[in-house]
Amino acid sequence: VTGEPPDPDLVAAHVAGDPEAFAELFRRHRDVLWAVALRTTGNPEDAADALQDAMLSALRSAATFRGRSAVRTWLYRIVVNACLDRLRRSAARPAVPLGGHDTPDPADAITRTGQRVDLLRALATLSPGQRAAVVLVDAHGLPVSEVAEILEVPVGTVKSRCARARAHLAKELGGPGGGSRRGGNPSAPSGVPSGYPWDGRR
């Protein structure tokens, strides 16, 4: 939007002592960072804790940002690392994310809540590396090259993690090539059957 400073300027302003700059940067990216944290950890409590850890880390390490990647990539990396650290310390159990958009059809809301829980449970059965890769590529639509930069692994590793994750999700959710628990759609682009609420809000 015209008149809004670009992300790198906000980082620089924060480092220079502007008390409002980092708050604006977080506000700008808050929703997508929360979605990444929720899908990577699998439950709202761990997601909130990981996001708080990540933002404190970003706040303190902003002076080390050199602009070699986009600010978004830098923030994603910090959030994903915080989530993976939390997953390594404790086995997270998915729960239903609260909030979201209202729907006029209660039956549809119940269906989507069930799908959301199924999806989070299926994601929780992936290895942390596979989960982070498939969330960033399939749920957020990031280029494989950017995800490789975020996760600090080769592009080929991201591709193989996504392929294994999709096959596993297809089996868990009844997608293409998987079982029939949820009646997968052969036209679905990944292991998640069409109609499943990747964003946790729809």
Q: What do the predicted segments below correspond to?
A:
Residues 35, 49-56, 60, 69-81:
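Structural recognition of an alpha-helix C-terminal capping motif at a helix-to-coil junction
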Residues 3-7, 85, 92-116, 143, ...:
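Internal acidic/polar
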Residues 57, 61, 86, 129, ...:
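Residue cluster at the C-terminal edge of the helix-turn-helix DNA-binding motif
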Residues 2-3, 13, 120-121, 125, ...:
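C-terminal edge and immediately downstream basic/flexible tail or linker adjoining helix-turn-helix-like DNA-binding
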Residues 15-24, 34-53:
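Short, charged helix-capping/linker segments at alpha-helix termini
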Residues 29, 50, 161-168:
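Residues within the DNA-recognition helix of helix-turn-helix
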Residues 45, 124-132, 136, 140-157, ...:
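Helix-turn-helix DNA-binding module
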Residues 60-67, 77-98, 111-112, 164:
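Arg/Lys-rich amphipathic alpha helix in sigma70-family domain 2
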